[in-house]
């Protein structure tokens, strides 16, 4: 049996793939021959994928968007996410629900819409982008950490349910990643993240993309239900 990291001819969806980590993932997949459809709400696409304006928090919008694609995807990357940080006692219901709706319910909507096509094909690969904060919690992120922890549970449950159908489901848990948004943070925040890091450096978006490409490729065909941390040793 030959093993390859190339993804020629395969169809993928990357949510939140128009910029940042999502753009790096999209570009890495396109570079390896995949046809990538980006589901995002932005009008600005910084990736090499085909942009579709889709609100993943809305189940009907997701179902319609997936059904309208030229071919069913056999790869899905649930990357889209938002933050509405506030301490637990001050967090509003809207701040809680908006993050859960996009980060967790959105991933569920995507998985439910894409999995039937993968099951019919007898193969498929799904990667959920979670976070080390879903494993350890973080002050001011009760909503975000809960959603990311929920994605880990979703990953493991989907891996059990879809494994017999030939579909792998895994997660990648980044720590601090040096996106444009991260570079705009106060220096003391970045310094604290560096001090947490065993490698004394922080990941780039391309580091997350590399892990995703591996999990989507045939090289990871016997890996499912796993959470791979790409955090330069922030959480050990």
Give the positions of each predicted feature.
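The beta1-alpha1 cofactor-binding region of Rossmann-like NAD(H)/NADP(H)-dependent oxidoreductases
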Residues: 54-64, 93, 206-207
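Active-site loop immediately N-terminal to the catalytic Tyr-X3-Lys motif
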Residues: 89, 136-142, 164-165, 200, ...
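Alpha-helical segment proximal to the catalytic Tyr-Lys
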Residues: 116, 160-164, 221
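C-terminal substrate-recognition "lid" of short-chain dehydrogenase/reductases
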Residues: 108-111, 201-230, 235
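Substrate-binding pocket helix/loop in short-chain dehydrogenase/reductase
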Residues: 87-88, 95-100, 182, 193
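Active-site helix of classical SDR
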Residues: 111, 147, 155
